Amino acid sequence: MIIKLISQPATFRHPRGWSSQHSLKRKWRSYEIEQYFYTHYAPLFAGHGNLAKLITSDAQNNESETHLALVLSDLNAAGFEYRHQQLSADACKPVLAWLAAFHARFIHQAPDGLWQQGSYWHLATRPDEFSKMAEGPLKQFGPAFDKTLQQCPYRTLIHGDAKVANFCFSADGQAVAAVDFQYVGGGIGVQDVAYFLGSVLSEQDLLNHTEDCLDYYFRELHSALSKQLAPEECEAVCNSWRQLYCVANADFHRFLAGWSPEHFKINRMLQQQTEQAIALVSA
């Protein structure tokens, strides 16, 4: 078993200076949502992909701190004992397949009890960072990126924090399980895909292999969607999401530029994707 124990003090100071009641409440709410996901949604994903099982949970409050404990099954003991910081494009395939299965399983699912907008970086969660951003295209088009993603008619549940560190791998790397569902909620699949690839591939691999990774993800997604949607709707979902991949990247770029403008993830690929997104939302 794994015990995830969260203690929230009455006050908190973020190392980058982003401390506010808004951020404090958002962080605590993320743990409540994770508990809700494991209780109500994780069982619906059984047979589609691997994740931990919630054994029990408990919450306690006092004047100085709030505590929440989640007792989860041990993924290491289940054969997912390996973690990675960087992968080749080919080694990303098991995670892309997991994401495709997750997005297909919850296509058109209302995010009841979860974040209405999944992810920790969407515009509504970052008013302080956005207000302090330097003037420029990212600030100018930030609201348009957000609106474009929200208005996509083909919505699903997204993991919301699908970095490589939140995936556990089998010894041969061919099977994965996901953890940390604090920011699960409504969205479109390429938000997870863009975030994952940006977390795991080198800048050169992003430039050289992003299209190959997207091809693989969309093959897996189409296959999974075809079991529950009509062929024309499968095509519509895949075409819509693929077109919005650049917007998902640009939206994350907007977050990074406000939160940590010197971040290493602001690379040539992210900048290229942002230029494409600006052209798309300006058309």
What are these regions (language model features)?
Residues M1-G118:
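Conserved ATP-binding subdomain of kinase catalytic cores across diverse folds
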Residues S23, Y36, G186-S226, A248-R268:
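Active-site activation/catalytic loop segments of kinase-like enzymes and analogous catalytic loops
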Residues Q35, D74-L75, G160-A162, F181, ...:
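Generic detector of well-ordered alpha-helical packing
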Residues S64, A91, Y154, I158-H159, ...:
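Secondary-structure capping and boundary motifs in well-ordered enzyme cores
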Residues A78-H159, C168-A171:
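ATP-dependent phospho-/nucleotidyl transfer catalytic cores
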Residues H222-N239:
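Short mixed-charge
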